[in-house]
């Protein structure tokens, strides 16, 4: 008998199986990886629209007098930059400046902030906030209360309009709406680099919304897309993935996420450590690698400048858009590696030539 914990499942597994999905574990969840193939789903998203079920993402609610003020004193970004109807990328750090998680904070009201962390880190984020919260505030884990459906791509607005859902929000804005009697929070957010939306219907009613979105996506020439395409899309954009480009050992500064830190704030988790690192300068930074020849790079490979190890790959894939192998790598800042320079990556004892570039690998079209 296996002692492995049973994988959690989203609310739409039967629908994914009916669509021919293949599945894999991600963050403790059984998730659809692909339907017709990662490359075709990637291209459908770049050229028309992709429909992603990312209900494994966490959800949590901070509620009570001073909720916004408390979240602002805990998470890195300055919540005072936004207000109700807006969302913000931010980070939850430990006192050493390591990243417990990166997440999206939705400003509902001064006394209500809705959070969407990564699946595997939800409990840790909730625990960190609960440990610091003053009396009168509640931090509630709502992981299975809401599904998350992402519609991404240049024709995503047409898809939502076909369902009568709001589309006029600015990037990182959101609006509460409904479809066929089901309440839906519609957010102008995403993880693909394309114009897109993320929708949060109630967990138990997600199928109604998913079915309608799937039909509308097909009408514009798009398709359902799995986590395989989500990863190739985000890697082309150079977006960090926790556990790869961000972790307890990889700080926001080392991930070039200093823009998501409110440096003028009096308090946030990890502030002193991050201020010290900012003053000294991060010891390593993410760079992009484009393979010169054929092949695919994977995480955990040694990057060399000549014969000297200077870093390690954190993500790697074949880019369907560029038709080459690409990777993200953490490179030592004192190694003197410049954009445009040729370096090598050790792939099972073979030196693979790559060009150093500054991500993103393709142009962002989020706005």
Curated annotation (Swiss-Prot):
SUPFAM superfamilies: Aminomethyltransferase beta-barrel domain, Folate-binding domain. One of its GO terms (molecular function) is aminomethyltransferase activity. It catalyses: N(6)-[(R)-S(8)-aminomethyldihydrolipoyl]-L-lysyl-[protein] + (6S)-5,6,7,8-tetrahydrofolate = N(6)-[(R)-dihydrolipoyl]-L-lysyl-[protein] + (6R)-5,10-methylene-5,6,7,8-tetrahydrofolate + NH4(+). Keywords: Aminotransferase, Transferase. InterPro entries: GCS_T, GCS_T_bac, GCST_C, GCV_T_N, GcvT/YgfZ/DmdA, GcvT/YgfZ_C, TrmE/GcvT_dom1. Pfam families: GCV_T (PF01571), GCV_T_C (PF08669). Transmembrane segments: none annotated. Its EC number is 2.1.2.10. One of its GO terms (cellular component) is glycine cleavage complex. The keyword Metal-binding does not apply. One of its GO terms (biological process) is glycine decarboxylation via glycine cleavage system. The glycine cleavage system is composed of four proteins: P, T, L and H. The glycine cleavage system catalyzes the degradation of glycine. Belongs to the GcvT family. This is Aminomethyltransferase. It comes from Mycobacterium ulcerans (strain Agy99).
